[in-house]
Regions:
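Periodic short-repeat tracts
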Residues: 8-12, 17-18, 23-28, 32-33, ...
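Short, contiguous pre-domain boundary segments
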Residues: 82-106
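Conserved AMP-binding/adenylate-forming core of the ANL superfamily
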Residues: 109, 158, 175-229, 247-252, ...
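A short N-terminal helical cap/helix-turn-helix that marks the beginning
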Residues: 112-133, 152-176, 334
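AMP-dependent adenylate-forming
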Residues: 161-188, 302-306
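Conserved pre-ATP/AMP-binding loop-to-beta segment of ANL
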Residues: 171-173, 295-297, 308-341, 348
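Conserved S/T- and glycine-rich ATP-binding loop of Class I adenylate-forming
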Residues: 215, 232, 336, 342-345
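Structural core segment of the AMP-binding/adenylate-forming
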Residues: 234-317
Length: 353
């Protein structure tokens, strides 16, 4: 009985010790697990905060950098445009301005509230051969977009640019020309402009240019380029100006696309110390343009160039003895004035008509 009692006490003690050990082990495990979780959470929070802080710092830095770049550009522009100074408009100058801010806002509001009446009045600012009675006809639909302005009126752009100024401004400067060289410059009066434009207009008519014909202008930056545009407008021909730096292929493409039968160019252009072979480029382009009837050539530098019989004519030959009077052609307000092509840097050049 004693032995049994001892064994029973021993077992109970063992069980108690085992339970105690297990309980201690569990408690330790729980504590360690909680500690680990707490450390993990703390680390996560710290990492998240750090990330957010880095992100914010980067954003702030990027924003500051952008602002700094913008401000630097602004300052550079201001310096370039005004030599480092900002010139405020004087009160005397503001008083003589054609329109002030209030006047502009008033006009704008009128144009929105009563659009047709507003443009009816604005249209009177230019001279009409036959005054308009209809202001606009606009259609917006999936099938058709059609926009017409002053479409029953007739006028001439060349007349509006030159002749209407002659009664009071004949001897005033119409064009200030600055050549490639600082010493090459001139001031052209309205009367001189009218005479030169009319002489060229008559010369163009003499070689067969008529109302509706397309004329390509491939010229250097000289007054004759302006005379050419205005002469075309005077006789109702549609002009297409092509930049004098374009290649023969680019020139040919534009001549063909606008169905031009006449070209006005020069022997050469000048850019700095470099001579631009305009006539040579034109000759190369015209090999692909069999429909071109005449090519008018301005003797600008006096360079030795080839002249093709029956097709090429000198600018001075068709203008020197021509009359300084040329009646402006009556044109409908919706008739085309000029064709201009985009550079074609993103594909085929687009047409502005």
């Amino acid at each position: 009985a004693k032995k049994k009692k001892k064994k029973s006490i021993k077992k109970i003690k063992k069980k108690k010790v085992s339970k105690k050990k297990k309980s201690i082990k569990k408690t330790k495990k729980k504590k360690v697990s909680k500690k680990k979780k707490s450390i993990k959470k703390t680390k996560k929070k710290k990492a998240s905060k750090k990330k957010k802080s880095i992100k914010k710092t980067k954003k702030k830095k990027a924003s500051k950098k952008k602002k700094s770049i913008k401000n630097t550009k602004k300052k550079k522009t201001e310096k370039q445009s005004s030599g480092g100074k900002i010139f405020k408009v004087s009160t005397a100058w503001s008083k003589n301005a054609l329109i002030d801010k209030k006047g502009y806002e008033k006009k704008y509001n009128e144009s929105v509230k009563n659009n047709e009446a507003f443009w009816s009045e604005e249209g009177k600012r230019i001279d009409w051969i036959k005054p308009y009675s209809k202001i606009k006809d606009i259609t917006y639909s999936k099938e058709k977009v059609d926009i017409k302005w002053f479409y029953d009126g007739t006028l001439n752009v060349s007349y509006n640019c030159i002749d209407r100024h002659l009664p009071h401004k004949a001897n005033d400067t119409a064009i200030i020309f600055e050549g490639d060289e600082p010493s090459v410059d001139s001031k052209i009066t309205y009367q001189e402009l009218k005479d030169e434009v009319c002489k060229l207009a008559n010369g163009l008519k003499e070689i067969g240019v008529k109302k509706g014909d397309r004329v390509t202008i491939y010229m250097p930056m000289v007054p004759q380029a302006v005379y050419s545009m205005l002469a075309c407008a005077r006789i109702g021909a549609v002009h297409s100006v092509v930049f004098g730096g374009f290649s023969a292929d680019s020139l040919a493409g534009r001549i063909i696309d606008c169905k031009s039968e006449f070209v006005i160019t020069a022997d050469q252009g000048v850019r700095g110390a470099k001579a631009i072979p305009l006539k040579n480029t034109t000759d190369e382009a015209l090999q692909k343009c069999p429909d071109v009837k005449k090519c008018v050539v301005l003797k600008h530098t006096g360079a030795d160039i080839a002249m093709k019989d029956e097709r090429d004519v000198w600018y001075h030959d068709i203008t020197s003895n021509a009359s300084t009077d040329c009646e402006p052609e009556e044109m409908n307000a919706e008739d085309p004035l000029f064709i201009l092509y985009t550079s074609g840097s993103t594909g085929k050049p687009k047409v502005c008509f």
